[in-house]
């Protein structure tokens, strides 16, 4: 059980501008990257492999294929480094964690789109 003051501070840090998404959805995460003294936005496009809902400590993992290699990146949902999240496609999956997708390639790695 958390202290009421801690809960109040955490509640003020939560972001409300992010869209709702689920595992399997194809999303683009635009995040701020700092290189030296310059800042720019970099896009990471892939599908949501897993989502962890823990209030301020929520996180999600996005997987994409880059030059034939699978790349996974975990983001903190309420991070100030995330500029925006764009949901490209909604998926119809029956699992909460899509770890089995790591071993699939080609046509086997397709996800059914929600109609």
Curated annotation (Swiss-Prot):
GO terms for molecular function: structural constituent of ribosome. GO terms for biological process: translation. It comes from the Bacteria. Keywords: Ribonucleoprotein, Ribosomal protein. One of its GO terms (cellular component) is cytosolic large ribosomal subunit. Transmembrane segments: none annotated. InterPro entries: Ribosomal_bL19, Ribosomal_bL19_CS, Ribosomal_bL19_sf, Translation_prot_SH3-like_sf. The keyword Methyltransferase does not apply. SUPFAM superfamilies: Translation proteins SH3-like domain. Belongs to the bacterial ribosomal protein bL19 family. This protein is located at the 30S-50S ribosomal subunit interface and may play a role in the structure and function of the aminoacyl-tRNA binding site. This is Large ribosomal subunit protein bL19.
